[in-house]
Amino acid sequence: MPVAPLASNSSPLSNIECTVPDRRGPDVTTENVDRHYLRMPHSERGMVVGLFGGSFNPPHQGHALVAEIALKRLGLDQLWWMVTPGNPLKSRNQLAPLAERIAESERVAADPRVKVTAFEQTLGTSYTANTLARVKARNPHVHFIWIMGADSLQTFHKWQKWQEIARTFPIAVIDRPGATLSFLSSKMARTFDFARVDEDDARILWKKRAPAWTFIHGPRSGLSSTAIRNGSSHSDAE
């Protein structure tokens, strides 16, 4: 069954700036990574928390924009910026050290509600589905939403247990260059067409029982980690 676009109200986006300011991050070393970043951030009962995971190799203002849109449109109390030790779908050869990616993430994550963390290193989980299951088990009274950029949807069905991910927490898909319309053809969008929530209801997505997902339109940054590593700054693909 084809997935039809949902009507959206663009007025909430008028208060979202396309440029997200930098903040000066701490002096991150291997020692204080162990001390400060390998535990799950503290959260209170009843909080609404976004989970934004990635290799962030390197992190950039496009990632910060996704985080800021998610905070505003979803009404999040916190957003956990989860720097993964590795990515099963990507080569480790070009992966910067974890401490470096954490330090850069702290620099670009401007909002104090963003909690940069690398707790997956401690869990020893290689796949998102396993990580989310552990997060859910340890925080039964917190309302989580999985955050992902729309450019990831085309390969989401290649993730291990991807349908289990969709059934663990509601998902918010944030618009990215080149994905505004193409996301409709993704296997995830077609498989879970029945579970799509109008983006006008994004602030109550946390109340929905998974599977539930929404696509959030908004300002888009063409910045790409791959392009930055290759010496450019923009890419339509990432």
Residue ranges and their predicted role:
Residues 2-238:
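Nucleotidyltransferase catalytic core that binds NTPs
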